[in-house]
Each structure stands twice: as C-alpha cells, then as structure tokens.
Amino acid sequence: WMDTAMVELKKAIKKTDLLIINDEEAEQLTGEKNIVKSAKKILKMGPRYSIIKKGDKGSVLISNSKKYNLPSYPVLKVIDPTGAGDSFAGGLAGCLASEDKINFESIKKGMICGTITASFCIESFGVEGLKKLDKIKLNKRVEIFKSYLMKVS
C-alpha cells in the first residue's frame, strides 16, 4: 500500500507525534534495513517518537536522544499471530489514554501494555484471546512481564 500512497503517507507522518510501524514497513518507508537508522530517518520526517515492531522479537522505541528495546512476552504456544501488531498498537494507545503526559517514559509503559495485549491475541485464533481479556488478567501478566524484565536487565 505504501507504493500507491507514499506522498499522502509522508504528509500524515509529518503531523504525528508517534509512529508505530513494523520493521518491513520501516525499511520500505526509509530504504534502511537497520532498525535504528530507519527509526532516525522516520524522526526526521516529523514524529517525536518512532516504535518499530519486530514481530516475535519485540519492539524498539526511538527518540532523538533515547532508545528502548522491549522483548516480546514469552507465551507458551502461539496459535495465530494475525492481529498481534494491531493489538500491540491498541494496547499501547489504551494505556497512553490514561496518562497525564505523553513522553518517553509513558510510551515505554504503553509498550508493555501493548506487548501484553498482543500476547493474549496470539494465544487464540482471531479475536478470541482478546475477548477473554479483562483488566485483572492484563495487569497480572504485566506484573509477570515486568518481573521478567527486571531479571534480564
């Protein structure tokens, strides 16, 4: 779709604060295979922050002065990855909607919520995993993930 709408896409990107895009789209948009270089080129297009999703390898948040890598949540069995990226973006947006300020730290927090939302998505076909999701399950898995992140950092 980028091939047919690149001019319009770049106009829209210029007006965004945060662009969430997958690694293949980032390469197509910037011509860069390296994720960090690609994200830096995206920042020059207008956004203050860029998140590049890396599928089962997690995601990376880049600003002009900072970088944050987040792994994916280690689910026991992936049933269907369809919709995981959209679930990530939706979970992130939902978390950011409850924040007073949108900044690097609040986006990092949102990425964790997005990662956990995506983890529920991939455990079932279609939206079935998300239909079973509630705030208690989400928060429980967020805490498990945070403890995992503390151990690996």
What are these regions (language model features)?
Residues 1-40, 58:
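Conserved beta-alpha-beta core of the PfkB/ribokinase-like small-molecule kinase fold
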Residues 35-153:
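Conserved phosphate-binding/catalytic region of the ribokinase-like
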